[in-house]
């Protein structure tokens, strides 16, 4: 084909991958590499393909490359990566299944070493499927004691399948912009709390604390937190200043305390992925985008505009750039995983975060003026208080979210019961983490004291 354009070039190596085949070619003497780029559109037409990616030159070689789409693409199932030795060889950090590279290698990355990830791509290119693959990777490998997730889903439907999972920090995905900003604020405060705690106990990071500084018989592990934002553009449109400030601060400081972010957008513009955000998140994934300018925003280089869609992606990090086919996980498989986790595990959610994002106060019932009405209302409160405490004793731990889920209460009403139980000496104070409050009485002791009161 090159001969048709009067360019002497020799194929010196070729390798077929899941999505494309890479051909390495050597130019004849006296020909400039710019000549290859000038015939790109002609090559696409001559080869009857949708797209071609030209690598000029290939680092460390006296050659250039042509990435040409395969007529039949190989599917890279997430299951094959999850069962691979690369994924299961260690439990350290947070292992994520990305996909398969040109030579068929399973590409597994550690989020804790990134320590944050930026994902961008046009609609329908595989971005949402990739996010699901990352989330399911975490669900397969890590318990809620190891990793907890916060899911921000302004589009309201993309991440709804994960609600009420034990691995979530709160039961629902976060949909409202105001709640998302409150979540980011809470995360920065949690980061500060963790660093203050590390200073008090004399350790430098979360791994040191979990592996040596805590009393494993008495103190639970400190879990890592992964924040997933499915569409950054929506947040930046309505609260750019606050969102950017919180995201940058977390990106700069949160690695050692075990807080990580995965931020995705279908609009890789400088208004969404600002210079400050880019400067602090160096691990990035690009799916197919509309233009070379969009590619530069996410990768700092062109190339993503030549990707083929349907999971074809480029991963850029401090270690270099890799093109691969992203892992595929179907919705039916996600539902099966989530249903199994819910059926076999109890959920204990974080009341602190739930409180922080509660923007609309619950409307309290109107008090009845008559003394009879007041007594009746007090009796109702006492009876519900008793049932809530008996539920906590049966479960062995107490939390606002547990009262909400069991009795169908709003947050403020459930909090009122828990605060009353603490004030009467039935429950211990609120603790950091997912362990809930300590129950201070047996069922017999509680019933005896409660009836006396």
Where are these regions (language model features)?
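P-loop NTPase catalytic phosphate-binding loop
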Residues: 9, 22-26, 35, 44, ...
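Terminal-proximal interaction/regulatory segments of ATP-powered molecular machines
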Residues: 1, 11, 359-453
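Short, charged/polar, Gly/Pro-enriched secondary-structure boundary elements
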Residues: 29-33, 71-77, 444-449
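A short interface-forming secondary-structure element
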Residues: 24-33, 38, 408-409
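Long, charged amphipathic helices and adjacent flexible linkers at domain junctions
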Residues: 347-362
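Short beta-strand
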Residues: 10-16, 54-58, 429-431
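Short, low-order "capping/linker" segments at domain edges
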Residues: 65-75, 366-369
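N-terminal anchoring/assembly modules that precede and organize ATP-driven motor systems
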Residues: 1-26, 30
């Amino acid at each position: 084909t090159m001969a048709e354009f009067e360019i002497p070039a020799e194929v010196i190596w070729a390798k077929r991958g899941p999505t494309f085949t890479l051909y390495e070619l050597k130019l004849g003497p006296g020909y400039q590499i710019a000549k290859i780029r000038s015939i790109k559109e002609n090559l696409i037409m001559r080869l009857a393909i949708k797209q071609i990616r030209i690598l000029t030159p290939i680092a460390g070689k006296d050659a250039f490359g042509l990435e040409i789409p395969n007529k039949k693409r190989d599917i890279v199932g997430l299951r094959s990566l999850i069962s691979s030795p690369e994924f299961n060889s260690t439990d350290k950090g947070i292992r994520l299944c990305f996909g398969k590279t040109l030579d068929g290698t399973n590409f597994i990355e550690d989020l804790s070493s990134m320590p944050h990830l930026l994902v961008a791509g046009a609609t329908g290119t595989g971005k949402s499927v990739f996010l699901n693959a990352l989330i399911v990777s975490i669900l397969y490998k890590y318990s809620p004691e190891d990793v907890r997730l916060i899911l921000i889903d302004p589009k309201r439907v993309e991440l709804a399948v994960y609600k009420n999972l034990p691995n979530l920090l709160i039961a629902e995905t976060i949909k409202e912009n105001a709640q998302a900003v409150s979540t980011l604020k809470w995360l920065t405060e949690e980061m500060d709390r963790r660093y203050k705690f590390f200073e008090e106990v004399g350790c430098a990071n979360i791994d040191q604390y979990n592996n040596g500084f805590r009393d494993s018989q008495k103190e639970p592990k400190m879990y890592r937190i992964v924040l997933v934002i499915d569409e950054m553009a929506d947040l930046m449109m309505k609260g750019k200043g606050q969102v950017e400030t919180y995201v940058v601060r977390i990106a700069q400081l949160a690695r050692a305390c075990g807080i990580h972010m995965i931020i995705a957008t279908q609009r890789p513009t400088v208004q969404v992925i600002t210079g400050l955000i880019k400067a602090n998140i160096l691990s990035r994934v690009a799916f197919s985008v509309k233009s070379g300018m969009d590619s530069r925003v996410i990768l700092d280089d062109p190339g993503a505009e030549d990707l083929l869609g349907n999971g074809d992606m480029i991963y850029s990090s401090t270690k270099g750039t890799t093109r691969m086919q992203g892992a595929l996980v179907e919705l039916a498989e996600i539902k099966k995983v989530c249903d199994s986790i819910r059926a076999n595990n109890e959920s204990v959610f974080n009341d602190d975060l739930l409180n922080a994002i509660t923007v609309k106060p619950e409307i309290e019932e109107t008090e009845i003026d008559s003394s009879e009405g007041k007594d009746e209302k007090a009796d109702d409160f006492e009876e519900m208080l008793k049932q809530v405490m008996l539920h906590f004793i049966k479960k062995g731990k107490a939390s606002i979210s547990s009262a909400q889920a069991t009795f169908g209460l709003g947050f403020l009403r459930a909090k009122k019961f828990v605060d009353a139980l603490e004030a009467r000496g039935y429950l211990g104070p609120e603790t950091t983490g997912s362990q809930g409050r300590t129950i201070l009485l047996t069922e017999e002791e509680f019933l005896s004291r409660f009836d006396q009161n």
